[in-house]
Amino acid sequence: MFKFILVFLVIFLVSLPIFFTESKYYRGNISNHFNGKYFYNVSDLADNLKSKKHGGFFSYYLSKINYEKIHGKPIWQDKIITVKQFIPKDKIDDKSLHVSYIGHSTFLLQLQGLNILTDPIYSNIASPFSFIGPKRAIIPGINFDDLPKIDIVLISHSHYDHMDLPTIKKLQKKFKPQFITGLGNCYFLNNKRNLNLKCSELDWQDKIAISQNLNIHFYQAKHWSKRMMFGRNASLWGAFIIESKIGNIYFAGDTGYDSHFSIAQEKFKEFKLALLPIGAYKPEDFMLKFHLSPSQALQAHLDLNAKKSIAMHYKTFKLSQENYEDPVIDLEKEKKLRKIKDDFIILDVGKNLILK
């Protein structure tokens, strides 16, 4: 309890001086998911018009205590796991898609001569502080120095395990890629953190043309955003859809289950690949509002009409109360129940998959 109070006080005191300067990242027209001040999920419109709150740090902590009283503390990896790191090719010019799993929600996607990173995090701690927070449980599947020239970086939202500033700074210094993210995030990165990125902000349903044969769309997700203690829902979260000549790719970012998977399928018909989160789902009463369980990830896979799905967002950072192995165990159980075999897979960190 003392540790919890100490962490809260440190975060609060560090955040307080920047409350008035950092809580507003976007000013634009009111929409069905923006009330002029804050963004909200379409499915809980009524609640969000009244309040920008979804239940925060204290709500999670109380839920965590109650969960541990019944189930005990989660069994988690206490030493960092090493793997054989993959060395990717410089680029892929043929008609194939190369997918390399770096860990958590970070993938290297290589297609049509482009190298794309999703939600890159190479830090050892997913936190505003380098000394406290969720620690990395497994090394990145590709050494940073072995990354090919990165052309595009997709950032789904502002949480620390998805928008990792130390990694973004390293990518900018080495590659100067194009960053693509939701409304308000470029303002934060460039105006509040002075990173001088080539950065494009997208609203839901917006797209940006990368080349004649490749578009990147930003689509609805069910989540939220925040940096430090303040600025809740001041920037937009979402999923990315890469529309290419070799097929459509869906990157879910962080999301709870809702109709947005079916909405994407109605527009794009099918997906060659979907990257779907399966971790951070316990305690269910709190976490499933904005995260997928393995069962829900399988349903999302079906909703999207995905030919192949790869699991992500598990076994890298301890973000919730499931045991280290639970996401994979629960996914395999659900696959057996639904008779889904090789369409939804676990791609180990450091492994590469080629789709043709």
Where are the predicted features?
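Catalytic core of the metallo-beta-lactamase
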Residues: 104-110, 210-272, 288, 292-295
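Active-site metal-binding motif and surrounding structural segment of the metallo-beta-lactamase
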Residues: 132-181, 269-275
